[in-house]
Amino acid sequence: MKELLEKILRGIVKHPEEVVVMEFDEEGKKVYEIVVNEEDVGQVIGKDGRTIKSLKILLSALMGDSKEITIKVVR
């Protein structure tokens, strides 16, 4: 999933070479921390958080299990 998320993010940002995704488990949740160029933060979050919410929904559907997903954008 980490690789898929990186590929999607690289397709929507202006600085794809700076995209870094870290994946880990925290308190029974799957957590993805995203590091992008400061100029790309708004693009990743989207208007009213729509882009980041869509990414979360997509990953949840692909994982197909009951594990909750959290996506954090780190600067």
Curated annotation (Swiss-Prot):
Domain KH, chain residue ranges per copy: 29-75
SUPFAM superfamilies: Prokaryotic type KH domain (KH-domain type II)
A Pfam family matched in the record: KH_KhpA-B
Record keywords: Cell shape, Cell wall biogenesis/degradation, Chaperone, Cytoplasm, RNA-binding
Domain of life (superkingdom): Bacteria
Main localisation: cytoplasm
UniProt keyword annotation of Protein biosynthesis present: no
Disulfides per UniProt: none
Gene Ontology molecular function: any one: RNA binding
Presence of keyword Cytoplasm: yes
InterPro entries xrefs: KH_dom-like_a/b (IPR015946), KH_sf_prok-type (IPR009019), KhpA (IPR020627)
GO CC aspect terms: cytoplasm
CDD domains named in the record: KH-II_YlqC-like
Cellular compartment(s): Cytoplasm
Biological processes per GO annotation: cell wall organization; peptidoglycan biosynthetic process; regulation of cell shape
Known function: A probable RNA chaperone. Forms a complex with KhpB which binds to cellular RNA and controls its expression. Plays a role in peptidoglycan (PG) homeostasis and cell length regulation.
Self-association state and partner proteins as the record states: Forms a complex with KhpB.
Family that this chain belongs to: Belongs to the KhpA RNA-binding protein family.
Protein name: RNA-binding protein KhpA
Annotated gene: khpA
